[in-house]
Amino acid sequence: MFTLKILVYTVVIFFVSLFTFGFLSNDPSRNPNRKDLE
């Protein structure tokens, strides 16, 4: 069960970070200097 819990937490953190990065990278008002990192 411990390994399963670690796997679940890893997947959740991965998706949350991916969603956050995507949201911030698509918001030019918050990151005006990241337009060249498309």
Curated annotation (Swiss-Prot):
Transmembrane segments: 4-24
Topological type in the membrane: Single-pass membrane protein
Main location: plastid
UniProt GO BP: photosynthesis
InterPro entries: PSII_PsbI (IPR003686), PSII_PsbI_sf (IPR037271)
Keywords linked to the UniProt accession: Chloroplast, Membrane, Photosynthesis, Photosystem II, Plastid, Reaction center, Thylakoid, Transmembrane, Transmembrane helix
Places the protein is found: Plastid, Chloroplast thylakoid membrane
Superkingdom of the source species: Eukaryota
One Pfam entry name: PsbI
GO cellular component terms listed in the entry, alphabetical order: chloroplast thylakoid membrane; photosystem II reaction center
Entry keyword annotation includes Mitochondrion: no
PANTHER family given in the database record: PHOTOSYSTEM II REACTION CENTER PROTEIN I
Subunit structure: PSII is composed of 1 copy each of membrane proteins PsbA, PsbB, PsbC, PsbD, PsbE, PsbF, PsbH, PsbI, PsbJ, PsbK, PsbL, PsbM, PsbT, PsbX, PsbY, PsbZ, Psb30/Ycf12, at least 3 peripheral proteins of the oxygen-evolving complex and a large number of cofactors. It forms dimeric complexes.
Stated family: Belongs to the PsbI family.
Function, as annotated: One of the components of the core complex of photosystem II (PSII), required for its stability and/or assembly. PSII is a light-driven water:plastoquinone oxidoreductase that uses light energy to abstract electrons from H(2)O, generating O(2) and a proton gradient subsequently used for ATP formation. It consists of a core antenna complex that captures photons, and an electron transfer chain that converts photonic excitation into a charge separation.
Protein name: Photosystem II reaction center protein I
Biological source species: Emiliania huxleyi (Coccolithophore)
Upper lineage: Eukaryota, Haptista, Haptophyta, Prymnesiophyceae, Isochrysidales
